Amino acid sequence: MKIRFCGAARSVTGSCHMITFEGGSILVDCGMRQGEDAHTDYGEGDFPFIPSDIKALLITHAHIDHTGMVPLLVKRGFNGPIFSTEATAKLCGIMLPDSAHIQEQDAEYQNRKNERAGKPLVEPLYTAQDAENSLRLFKGVRYDSIIQICPGVEARFTDVGHLLGSAAIEVWVTEGGKKTRIVFSGDIGRDDRPIIKDPESPEGADYLVLESTYGDRLHTVSTDDEKEQEFAEILREGIARGGNIVIPAFAVGRTQELLYYIKRFLVNDTVPGLEKVPVYIDSPLGIKATRIYAGCGADCYDDETKVLARSGDLFEFDSLHIAETVEQSMEINELTGCNIIISASGMCEAGRIRHHLKNNLYKANATVVFVGYQAVGTLGRIIIDGAKKVKILGVQVIINAAIKQIEGFSGHADQSELLEWVSEIPETPKKIFLVHGEDKAINALKGKLQEKGYSIEVPEMFEEFDLGTGEVYATATKKITEAAKQRRRQAADIRASLKRLIFAATELLSAEPDRAKDMEEDIGGLADRMEKLVK
């Protein structure tokens, strides 16, 4: 019996793990690689296995870095069952078509450039039809039930409180009359988060594949009450300022948490004057996800949410408005007074949030509240790092608004919470494989676990471990050297700079004269950066 790490090895995205046994192979997760790794390995479509040979796919949760390559897997020949919790299947029903739409848009944009340059046209990584084909293979399962995956393989999904429907998956493989339990943690959440249940540890594990996203970090806001109080105080201050309160938020998970808190504030009269403030959800995907969250039953809700849900729609209140169409979104920009605007994307890199930032950042009475991680280089990160002005949709915008950040909304367990989750597994696993983390986080968590007596492995991409003999194989591709990693990071950086350069040049062609000089300076800076990168 062997386990091969086909993704999220020494990186955070692209989770994909393969168990090979005498009866065949199964996959756990099939995620899309993002960020600097998006164009490496099978990020552009080459799997390190034959999709049609895979017996079944198990999904820990719906986030695209765990599911984003599922439509491509099906497109390339996989036709087996896809097992997930029922809530995960529902969320994938909106997230995979949305991802396909992005793939089609990217291909269309690339083909316009290729056509002008006389280059061959490209196909999207996968299409909406591919996404639809993959959704037909999903089989929703209940938490804590042991199910048959294929001959010789059983599994159980245990709630880990990261996202609606998220799970750790216990996989039992019987080979040669011996049953081995391999546990995949998925992404582990935090205690006392709203709506969903607290993380549960599995009842046992011979081998554990453990995420390490925040293996080197301790969250500054430790309790849900502290986070709730901080959010309430920011809303009080924002209402007192009199301008709009703009909240960039991830469409799935974070948007629903915000609505949950706002409804609690209204029910408990926590924030004076809040009942007079209109609340707008301006994210088509966020609206669909909210409906899924509202329709889930007791299997997913924590006890407090069950009580709140009995009084009616979990997220519905009189001052809530939704903006599904472009026209409805544009109308929000004409509003006066104080309004709460929740919009995607969470890092402000795309989507309707950019229009709301453009129309509010320059206003001294406005408030912008960040409730999620902002990656280096994103517009959100630039703003929270103290920029005095930013360029949005081709326009320089001075930042006069109050900028706030709440760190306690993280959906990932920190180092102490990861250690606690592992310690609650009754028997010590023979081996823990650390994945889904950058080197710094992995090494920090590895040290802490080794201090407690655990045997730790940090797999490289495509490494295969024989669980019977303990042998390690570098299969499918050679090990990636540090020099190769650096070249790939550099290539990704060049691609990103080139994309921004092309976008800026396109905007310059239609720019007003008073903006053209600023745009020319930006283009010159990007060109200088690219020249340094390619030397």
Located regions from the model:
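Active-site metal-binding loops of divalent metal-dependent hydrolases
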Residues: A8-A9, C30-R33, A87, L163, ...
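A general structural motif
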Residues: D224-E228, D318-Q328, M347-E349, I384-K389, ...
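Core dinuclear metal-dependent hydrolase active-site scaffold
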Residues: M1-S52, N133-K197, E331-E334, I340, ...
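Hard-cation-handling environments
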Residues: I234-T378, V390-K391, P426, N443, ...
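Pre-active-site segment of Zn-dependent metallo-hydrolases
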Residues: A9-G14, F21-G80, S84-F138, I188-D198, ...
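A polyampholytic, Gly/Pro-enriched intrinsically disordered region
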Residues: Q103-E108, G297-S311, K391, Y473-A496
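Metallo-beta-lactamase
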Residues: S99-L163, A298-L335
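Cap/insert and terminal regions of metallo-dependent hydrolase folds
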Residues: A168, G189-D282, T367-G372, V390-P459
